[in-house]
Swiss-Prot record:
Remarks, miscellaneous: Leaves of the 'sweet herb' Stevia rebaudiana contain a mix of steviol glycosides, compounds that are unique in the plant world because of their intense sweetness and high concentration in leaf tissue. Stevia leaves have been used as natural sweeteners in South America for centuries.
Organism: Stevia rebaudiana (Stevia)
GO MF term set: quercetin 3-O-glucosyltransferase activity; quercetin 7-O-glucosyltransferase activity; steviolbioside glucosyltransferase activity (rebaudioside B forming); stevioside glucosyltransferase activity (rebaudioside A forming); UDP-glucosyltransferase activity
CDD domains linked to this entry: GT1_Gtf-like (cd03784)
Impact noted for substituting residue 207 to W: Reduces catalytic efficiency 13-fold for stevioside
InterPro entries: UDP_glucos_trans
Protein name: UDP-glycosyltransferase 76G1
Length: 458
């Protein structure tokens, strides 16, 4: 039983968490906040008004909305809310947000009760400007890395990739070659991940530098999943690292920016075990109508039941699923706008997950033992897809785009074909490793205990 005096002492420590305001970044930091709250810490969330979560889902947290309160600030107010340009908030706030963040932190630190102390600031790694602000206030900053250790390894290898010519967008001659130092990657994976190299160069350089300057890094992962990458992280980052698979602690449904369709569970309850393909390509991806129809035909040709999440705005130029022909679904499929993904993946009817290969989705599937079909839309996604399909062998990577025959074959291979049994078995084994890591003495259990002790000592 937990020592009550120890809990009281911990309650006097407050942690401030500051996520990047996009779904794939909000989910893990709010999961982390809940985990830390359960360990006795008081929680304050700094957040922009843009994409702010439903505070009513978190009555145990204090929220402060910062950095985009001024409608006269055209640098922020004129940015779109969807699409690639929405992400310009990140470099703009990094460049201009330091003074306001410092004021907000000072106010909170001064307002702390006599028996409560602000222990640290935990920010998304992409808020690299927060390091100098925290340093100026003698406040420790920890970083939550929302991508994989393998992805970080690729980031720190970018100078090498640049020198080898892998980042040259005009060089198409070596796309299928193995990357030097990364035999599991093809040159085309690197080109896809860093296609906006000139824009990413400064952002990633500063992110890496300030992550190395932080007081600690929390990884949404677990040792048994990425043990081969730990050596690189330990070599590159002097501060301690903590590997905690956040989906194994809490679902992310309460942090969703979109409304869930929960009627899907009635339909899933009527399906045989492991018979349904769950399809979702994340909260920001977009496809052309031609590709959308190719996805649809591949699903039908696979002859497997499917639950397909088509977010409004997913199909360019369409409101929702208007391009689909009448009668497309038949009796095998169901299309919805959004679902509580972790709960769906945990349902016994789900046999595979066709994903955009974002790290949150990938890790959620691993934690539920669900094999995957991987597509990607750039950024870290091709790296995740390659690592999971070719190194861990828990899925099939559709690396050549959208073609109905390849789609149907991949679905059947992962879900029902005998040749895909090793994929299904590998997925089950990884889930078991994740479960064991959370038991007392396991790597994730010990990592969380170490994190709590570390923050308490700051």
């Amino acid at each position: 039983m937990e020592n009550k005096t120890e809990t009281t002492v911990r309650r006097r420590r407050r942690i401030i968490l500051f996520p990047v305001p996009f779904q794939g970044h909000i989910n893990p930091i709010l999961q982390l906040a809940n985990v830390l709250y359960s360990k006795g810490f008081s929680i304050t969330i700094f957040h922009t008004n843009f994409n702010k979560p439903k505070t009513s889902n978190y009555p145990h947290f204090t929220f402060r909305f910062i950095l985009d309160n001024d409608p006269q600030d055209e640098r922020i107010s004129n940015l779109p809310t969807h699409g690639p340009l929405a992400g310009m908030r990140i470099p703009i706030i990094n460049e201009h947000g330091a003074d306001e963040l410092r004021r907000e932190l000072e106010l909170l630190m001064l307002a702390s009760e006599e028996d409560e102390e602000v222990s640290c600031l935990i920010t998304d790694a992409l808020w690299y400007f927060a390091q100098s602000v925290a340093d100026s206030l003698n406040l420790r900053r920890l970083v939550l890395m929302t991508s994989s250790l393998f992805n970080f390894h690729a980031h720190v290898s970018l100078p090498q990739f640049d020198e080898l010519g892998y980042l040259d967008p005009d060089d198409k001659t070596r796309l299928e070659e193995q990357a030097s130092g990364f035999p599991m990657l093809k040159v085309k994976d690197i080109k896809s991940a860093y296609s906006n190299w000139q824009i990413l160069k400064e952002i990633l350089g500063k992110m890496i530098k300030q992550t190395k300057a932080s007081s600690g890094v929390i990884w949404n992962s677990f040792k048994e999943l990425e043990e081969s990458e730990l050596e690189t992280v330990i070599r590159e980052i002097p501060a301690p690292s903590f590997l905690i698979p956040l989906p194994k602690h809490l679902t992310a449904s309460s942090s969703s920016l979109l409304d869930h369709d929960r009627t899907v569970f009635q339909w899933l309850d009527q399906q045989p075990p492991s018979s349904v393909l769950y399809v979702s390509f994340g909260s920001t991806s977009e496809v052309d109508e031609k590709d959308f129809l190719e996805i649809a035909r591949g699903l039908v040709d696979s002859k497997q039941s499917f639950l397909w999440v088509v977010r409004p705005g997913f199909v360019k130029g369409s409101t929702w699923v208007e391009p689909l022909p009448d009668g497309f679904l038949g009796e095998r499929g169901r299309i919805v706008k959004w679902v509580p993904q972790q709960e769906v993946l945990a349902h016994g009817a789900i046999g595979a997950f066709w994903t955009h290969s974002g790290w949150n989705s990938t890790l959620e599937s691993v934690c539920e033992g669900v094999p995957m079909i991987f597509s990607d839309f750039g950024l870290d996604q091709p790296l995740n897809a390659r690592y999971m399909s070719d190194v861990l062998k828990v899925g099939v990577y559709l690396e050549n785009g959208w073609e109905r025959g390849e789609i149907a074959n991949a679905i059947r291979r992962v879900m029902v074909d005998e040749e895909g049994e090793y994929i299904r078995q590998n997925a089950r084994v990884l889930k078991q490793k994740a479960d064991v890591s959370l038991m007392k003495g396991g790597s994730s259990y010990e990592s969380l205990e170490s994190l709590v002790s570390y923050i308490s000592s700051l």
